[in-house]
């Protein structure tokens, strides 16, 4: 038998897989779930840009993991790199105008997927789970 806490983490991991598969199978506007999350964080940030390391920390990945995800987004023009005028060692990831447009369109599809996954759940339960996840891992906003 395993602890309730360990079972919770296993179920969170399974849920993440279910969510990613659902998003990826629908290929929401050509974006996978991780792509969508990156665009969301950039879209929501001040000036629609972030340092790569800050973006990685915000979404819980390594800097190299974020770089692997950003390269295809950069190739298709959804994000770009911007250097810091004061410090050449610092660069920013910026969501492009086209990236903003695609994100806004994909957000509608993402909301529909979310409703499909969570439609039978009560708002109070969702708030409680959201609070627990925030306590465990922080808020992406």
Regions found by a protein language model. Give the residues of each.
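C-terminal regulatory/oligomerization modules of transcriptional regulators
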Residues: 1, 123-141
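N-terminal leader segment of winged-helix/HTH proteins
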Residues: 1-29
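Alpha-helical linker/hinge and terminal dimerization helices associated
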Residues: 12-15, 19, 23, 59, ...
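N-terminal helix-turn-helix DNA-binding core of bacterial DNA-binding proteins
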Residues: 21-62
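Short, hydrophobic-biased segments on the C-terminal half of alpha helices
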Residues: 52, 70-71
């Amino acid at each position: 038998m395993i602890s309730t806490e360990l079972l919770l983490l296993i179920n969170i991991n399974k849920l993440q897989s279910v969510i990613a598969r659902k998003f990826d199978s629908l290929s929401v506007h050509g974006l996978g779930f991780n792509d969508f999350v990156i665009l969301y964080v950039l879209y929501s940030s001040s000036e629609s840009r972030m340092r790569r390391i800050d973006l990685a920390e915000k979404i819980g990945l390594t800097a190299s993991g974020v770089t692997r995800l950003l390269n295809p987004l950069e190739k298709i023009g959804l994000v770009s790199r911007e250097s810091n005028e004061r410090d050449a060692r610092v660069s920013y990831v910026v969501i492009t105008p086209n990236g903003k447009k695609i994100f806004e369109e994909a957000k509608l599809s993402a909301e529909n997927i979310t409703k499909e996954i969570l439609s039978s759940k009560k708002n109070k339960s969702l708030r409680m789970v959201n609070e627990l996840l925030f306590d465990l891992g922080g808020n992406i906003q």
